[in-house]
């Protein structure tokens, strides 16, 4: 029997966080809190943004939460509990995560070991500014690009564009520097959270939403901006950037 979307999301949060229980209280509580408190995870599924994408690249993957979320979604769909009014569940052949922090990669490898061993997922400790992105049908970058200078951001985006297959999509969440108080709050929280997770950041390199959109359009993307701060005091925006068809 299919649950209501709200009930389904709660079940999915529990299922996706469960693999982290063996990694310690912090990893498990962080997984539950992030998956339950961040609207982007449910939105990716409800809007079908990753449906049909076989090769997914998650840049700044942390401890692999997006991968665990997609695996839990696929399992739920196979059990017949998928919300009837949602697009089909994503069923990627492989999800590849790139993460700067080695301890997060260790957590991801440990928590999602069955998927790693089955070839469904892989996690690499690397700097996004120099990592090989390979080839992908979808690239996800959530809340990490503003950690590096603008020129480095532009280089990452250009390499993402080169890595995407025809018809590929980039899902990029950013803070809108023109977002007023919400933007200031999100920056303060960002500094606190990244410090707790072992990063040492003195500067965040942010742009107004219009500047992000202009940059992506200049790389050949059609861009749709979707507010992605529901239930939070932040000024976050999800940019759905689809490669334009070449003549």
Show the residue positions of the predicted features.
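Class I (Rossmann-like) S-adenosyl-L-methionine-dependent methyltransferase catalytic domain
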Residues: 2-47, 52, 63-132, 169-247
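Conserved beta-strand/loop positions that form the S-adenosyl-L-methionine
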Residues: 59
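Conserved acidic residues
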Residues: 137
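A conserved beta-strand element that flanks and buttresses the S-adenosyl-L-methionine
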Residues: 140
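Short catalytic micro-motifs in class I SAM-dependent methyltransferases
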Residues: 143-144
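Helix-capping/helix-break motifs at membrane-protein junctions
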Residues: 149-150
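A short glycine-rich, Lys/Arg-flanked "PGG" loop and its adjoining helix->strand segment in the class I
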Residues: 154-166
């Amino acid at each position: 029997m299919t649950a209501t979307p709200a009930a389904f999301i709660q079940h999915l949060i529990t299922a996706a966080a469960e693999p982290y229980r063996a990694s310690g209280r912090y990893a498990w509580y962080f997984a539950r809190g992030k998956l339950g408190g961040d609207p982007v995870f449910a939105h990716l599924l409800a809007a079908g943004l990753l449906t049909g994408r076989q090769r997914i690249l998650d840049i700044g993957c942390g401890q692999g939460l997006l991968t665990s979320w997609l695996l839990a979604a696929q399992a739920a769909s196979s059990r017949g509990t998928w919300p009837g009014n949602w697009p089909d569940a994503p069923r990627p052949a492989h999800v590849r995560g790139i993460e700067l922090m080695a301890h997060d990669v260790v957590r991801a490898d440990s928590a999602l070991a069955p998927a790693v061993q089955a070839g469904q997922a892989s996690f690499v400790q690397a700097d996004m500014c120099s990592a090989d992105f390979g080839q992908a049908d979808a690239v996800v970058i959530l809340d990490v690009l503003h950690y590096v200078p603008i020129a480095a951001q532009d280089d990452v985006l250009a390499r993402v564009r080169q890595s995407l297959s025809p018809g590929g999509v980039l899902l990029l969440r950013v803070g809108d520097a023109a977002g007023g108080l919400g933007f200031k709050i999100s920056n303060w929280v960002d500094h606190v959270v990244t410090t707790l997770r072992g990063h040492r950041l003195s500067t965040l390199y942010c742009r107004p939403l219009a500047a992000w959109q202009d940059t992506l359009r200049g790389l050949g993307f059609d861009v749709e901006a979707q507010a992605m701060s529901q239930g939070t005091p932040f000024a976050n925006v999800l940019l759905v950037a689809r490669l334009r068809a070449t003549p």
